[in-house]
């Protein structure tokens, strides 16, 4: 079964190189898996992960966290901002984005902080970070 156009439908899937190449009623093939209970998903998004880099790589790194997420079926994760330095301005966000570009094996969208250093006093520079953030949070402080 596949979820197509808002409904579940019985169908055949052609998967080439790990990607769904066709959905429909297909001719017989030597390379067919029967109804073996396999479930195929296009990929999940986890909107609340703690990759902890930069600053706390002894707890988790972008490399290990994204590999674990990929193994669990995630193709995108949104990383919480409890880092050091906290992504509360463009410069600090760029440090995190550089590490993401270098080490992530899946798409990572970071959160920026709501307040400077997640202290709950002064608003962060959200305007200059918004284009590259999933949103803003002071989670994990």
Task: Name the predicted role of every residue range.
Residues 13, 18, 37, 48, ...:
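Divalent metal-coordination and catalytic microenvironments
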Residues 83-95, 99-141:
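Histidine/acidic-residue-rich, glycine-tolerant segments that coordinate divalent metal ions
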Residues 29, 40, 116-118:
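A short acidic, often aromatic-flanked loop/helix-cap motif at beta-alpha or helix-coil junctions
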Residues 27-29, 35-36, 72-75, 103-107, ...:
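Short coil/turn connectors at secondary-structure junctions
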Residues 5, 23, 35-36, 43-47, ...:
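Fold-independent oxyanion-binding glycine-rich loops
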Residues 36-103:
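Metal-associated gating/positioning segment near the N- to mid-region
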Residues 1-29:
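N-terminal metal-binding scaffold of metallo-dependent hydrolase/deaminase domains
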């Amino acid at each position: 079964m596949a979820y197509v156009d808002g409904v579940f439908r019985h169908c055949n899937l052609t998967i080439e190189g790990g990607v769904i190449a066709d959905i429909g009623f297909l001719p017989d093939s030597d390379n067919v898996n029967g109804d073996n209970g396999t479930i195929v998903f296009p990929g999940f998004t986890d909107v609340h992960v703690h990759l902890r880099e930069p600053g706390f790589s002894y707890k988790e790194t972008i490399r290990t966290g994204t590999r674990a997420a990929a193994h669990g079926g995630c193709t995108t994760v949104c990383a919480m901002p409890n880092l050091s330095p906290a992504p509360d301005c463009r410069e600090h966000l760029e440090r995190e984005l550089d590490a993401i570009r270098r080490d992530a094996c899946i798409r990572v969208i970071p959160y920026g902080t709501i307040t400077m250093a997640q202290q709950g006093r002064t608003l962060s520079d959200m305007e200059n970070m918004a284009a590259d953030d999933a949103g803003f949070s002071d989670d994990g402080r």
